[in-house]
């Protein structure tokens, strides 16, 4: 190789490594931003839950809070109060991830003192960055989400509103959360607690539900479409178009040529609900249910999903598409790094919780950079090998002198490295004036062959060179 060509291989390798490092740094930044955003979204949900509990508390205790607040002096609601009254679960923490504590400040409306308004404010702890405040304000779903940037004013998401904290008798600092509960919001909360609505309210079935017995005072219920009940007790007759019954209807068995329609439950005390052919159970309203069309599978009608707040258990669970979890993946069985495994692609964990993956029939630590060096021996002329491992193999060769020819040949050297038949690295000197050795290194992808050759002079008059080889692999 000519003198002015020396170093190009090293320069190209260095440039490639620099590009890889830049890409890794860029990707790490993107991942960090994603993790931060998910954390802020979680915080926003917690604030929404807390605010919803405070709203319900105010609605339940509207009259009491009217008596303990003025237009300038607030009634303060704390997390402890919400937990003690059952509006928050007992496990709800007093502070958020930044050590900030939520409180609701309830005051009378200045224009109409008979009505209440409130501001939920966080205080103490470590301030959130502005980026987090803006994100959380937009993600808060109960009330009007906002934030405090100057320590004095609450500003709404997208700067849609701005209110001085002093209007609510609240105090906080910059980098904190604020949620506005308007007069209309709290009036609705008060109405929710003590009214039985005559009309359906979308998303609020509780407003059409009785929570105690109702006494009709011997008056009638007229124009009823259907009466659905668990039991019925009648002091007189039950009259219908097709039959009159003074007691229970009992029978050993019944046969019907067409349909059986029941206005209530169909119950079996000690038997099965048996169907034949490819039929099963169907919910007519929503078009879902279960059936069997072969001897192996219980199927969902119309490919409906199955939803439960409990546990789904089976010998194996298979997803033909993606597998999602809204929380964490718990791997109960442990494996040992370095032990054999099958098939490749399995994911497990060791007894410390570190993730392992099955690679080339061996459990390996995910992302591990620990490797080992292997002495691949001393060779003359050429050496061929293959990377049979599951990760990149790094080859290091030194020497390349034609010492057996003696004289000037002992001072010349040459090493050439090939990967998959392509020349990757060269280091050579034909100057016989002084002694020297050559050194080359190159990477070999998994499953790829490689070769090292050593013939010190271009016309090979000095014969084959002697060199040593080492390999490094994770």
From Swiss-Prot:
The keyword Cytoplasm does not apply. Residues 1-361 are annotated as: Constant region. InterPro entries: Enolase-like_N, Shufflon_N. The keyword Glycoprotein does not apply. Keywords: Plasmid. It comes from the Bacteria. Residues 362-474 are annotated as: Variable region. Pfam families: Shufflon_N. Transmembrane segments: none annotated. This protein is expressed by a shufflon (= clustered inversion region that works as a biological switch). The orfs of this region share a constant N-terminus, while the C-terminus is variable. This is Shufflon protein A.
């Amino acid at each position: 190789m000519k003198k002015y060509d020396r170093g190009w291989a090293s320069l190209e390798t260095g440039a490639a490594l620099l590009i890889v490092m830049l890409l890794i740094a860029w990707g790490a930044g993107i991942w960090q931003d994603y993790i931060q955003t998910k954390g802020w979204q979680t915080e926003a949900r917690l604030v929404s839950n807390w605010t919803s509990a405070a709203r319900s508390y105010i609605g339940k205790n509207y009259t009491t809070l009217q008596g303990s607040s003025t237009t300038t002096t607030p009634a303060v609601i704390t997390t402890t109060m919400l937990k003690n009254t059952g509006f928050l679960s007992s496990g709800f923490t007093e502070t958020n991830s930044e050590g900030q504590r939520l409180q609701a400040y309830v005051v009378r409306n200045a224009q109409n003192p008979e009505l209440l308004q409130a501001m939920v404010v966080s205080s103490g702890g470590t301030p959130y960055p502005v980026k987090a405040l803006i994100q959380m304000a937009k993600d808060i779903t109960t009330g009007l989400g906002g934030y405090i940037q100057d320590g004095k004013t609450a500003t709404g998401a997208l700067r849609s509103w701005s209110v001085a904290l002093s209007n609510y008798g609240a105090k906080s600092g910059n980098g904190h959360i604020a949620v506005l509960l308007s007069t209309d919001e709290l009036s609705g909360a008060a109405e929710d607690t003590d009214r039985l609505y005559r009309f359906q309210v979308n998303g609020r079935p509780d407003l059409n539900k009785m929570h105690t017995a109702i006494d009709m005072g011997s008056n009638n219920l007229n124009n009823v479409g259907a009466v659905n009940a668990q039991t019925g007790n009648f002091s007189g007759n039950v009259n219908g178009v097709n039959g009159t019954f003074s007691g229970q209807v009992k029978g050993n068995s019944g046969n019907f040529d067409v349909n059986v329609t029941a206005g209530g439950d169909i119950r079996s005390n000690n038997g099965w609900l048996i169907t034949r052919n490819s039929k099963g159970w169907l919910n007519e309203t929503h078009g879902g249910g279960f059936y069997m069309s072969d001897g192996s599978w219980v199927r969902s009608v119309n490919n409906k999903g199955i939803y439960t707040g409990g546990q789904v258990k089976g010998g194996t669970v298979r997803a033909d598409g993606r597998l999602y979890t809204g929380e964490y993946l718990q791997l109960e069985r442990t494996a040992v790094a370095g032990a054999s495994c099958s098939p490749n692609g399995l994911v497990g964990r060791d007894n410390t919780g570190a993730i392992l993956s099955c690679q080339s029939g061996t459990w390996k630590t995910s992302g591990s950079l620990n490797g080992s060096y292997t002495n691949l021996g001393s060779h003359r002329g050429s050496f061929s090998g293959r990377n049979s491992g599951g990760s990149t193999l790094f080859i290091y060769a030194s020497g390349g002198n034609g010492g057996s020819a003696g004289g000037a040949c002992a001072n010349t050297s040459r090493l050439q490295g090939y990967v998959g038949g392509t020349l990757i690295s060269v280091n050579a000197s034909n100057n016989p004036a002084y002694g020297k050795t050559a050194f080359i290194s190159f990477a070999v992808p998994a499953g790829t062959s490689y070769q090292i050759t050593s013939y010190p002079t271009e016309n090979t008059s000095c014969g084959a060179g002697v060199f040593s080889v080492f390999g490094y692999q994770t």
